[in-house]
């Protein structure tokens, strides 16, 4: 089974798709691997990892709170890193995921780290036969879901701009990939016609469809903690689409569409016959003034802390990485 990478914006259904694929007998997909972001660099692709840096990476992984969410015994992999003098970046990444794969008694592995879309060039150099699945969701539902999980995301103009930008970046990365190795899936299609959509994904991944994939929710508590949406602990429900129609105010709908309407239409999402008012423009300006610096600070702070943690071989000290699954693998 070729490695499968799921990418997308936050709150777009990446976890749902991960759990569906993870319910297949041949594929194991752990929690997010943002902790690998500092290592997915061309200098490591060319020169590999060796000496003191490799030792620090082993220590970094051992205490990383996000890696702990993978919920398996990684001690053998950590020991193997400590016993080596050098390792290629491919062997490190492949070995890490294979160690999880073996613990799950699966034949192949995948990844669900939405932000890896920024590193697709490096990932495809590491794994030329990898399959990339981009899952997209109506941005207005993304905004509504995100602000429910994190009150600091309650800036409709900022989220609309970020959603539009990230999809542009994903599209730009995917444009360099041959058609047979990339696929775009709408979250809404996954809910409306699950059997057909999942069968198509299986064909793309080169694996047979298994009915057990539709019962993914029966084992969700082995693979995700309660910090995720409650929806992934139950069966697929088409009613969970397009909630923005009831939850967003008219002003929020006007603003989101004014900022990202072109992208909504491109992916066949409904748009309304509304135009931004002067009061909306002022609201967006206040949104951007307050929300953009906050979002930029959050992103920069997280990146800096992870980079420092790798170099020091310690914990990044990040908070709110999530809760452990209820059941141990």
What are these regions (language model features)?
Residues 13-14, 138:
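Residue-level detector of functionally special positions within alpha-helical transmembrane segments
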Residues 15-26:
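A conserved segment at the C-terminal end of the G1
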Residues 97-235:
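PAPS-dependent sulfotransferase catalytic domain
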């Amino acid at each position: 089974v070729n490695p499968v990478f799921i990418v997308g914006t936050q709150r777009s259904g990446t976890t749902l798709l991960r759990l569906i694929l993870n319910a297949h007998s041949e594929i194991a997909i752990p929690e997010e691997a943002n902790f690998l972001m500092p290592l997915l660099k061309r200098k490591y692709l060319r020169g590999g990892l060796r000496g003191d840096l490799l030792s620090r990476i082993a220590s970094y992984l051992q205490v990383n709170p996000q890696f702990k969410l993978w919920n398996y015994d990684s001690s053998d992999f950590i020991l193997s890193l400590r016993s080596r003098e050098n390792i290629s970046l491919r062997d490190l990444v492949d070995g890490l995921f294979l160690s999880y794969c073996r613990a799950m008694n699966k034949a192949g592995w995948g990844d669900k780290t939405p932000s890896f879309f920024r590193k697709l060039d490096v990932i495809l150099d590491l794994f030329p036969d990898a399959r990339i699945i981009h899952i997209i969701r109506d941005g207005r539902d993304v905004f509504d879901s995100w602000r429910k999980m994190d009150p600091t995301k309650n800036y409709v103009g900022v989220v609309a701009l970020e959603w539009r930008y990230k999809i542009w970046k994903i599209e730009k990365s995917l444009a360099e990939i041959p058609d047979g190795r990339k696929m775009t899936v709408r979250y809404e299609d996954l809910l409306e016609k699950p059997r057909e959509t999942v069968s198509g994904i299986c064909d793309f991944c080169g694996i047979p469809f298994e009915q057990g994939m539709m019962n993914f929710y029966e084992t969700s508590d082995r693979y995700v903690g309660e910090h995720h949406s409650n929806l992934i602990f139950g069966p697929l429900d088409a009613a969970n689409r397009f909630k923005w129609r009831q939850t967003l105010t008219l002003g929020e709908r006007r603003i989101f569409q004014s900022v990202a309407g072109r992208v909504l239409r491109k992916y066949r999402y409904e748009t309304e016959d509304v135009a931004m008012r002067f009061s909306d423009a002022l609201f967006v300006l206040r949104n951007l003034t307050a929300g953009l610096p906050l979002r930029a600070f959050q992103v920069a702070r997280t990146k800096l802390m992870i980079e420092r943690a790798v170099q020091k071989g310690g914990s990044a000290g990040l908070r709110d990485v999530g809760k452990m699954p209820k059941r141990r693998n």
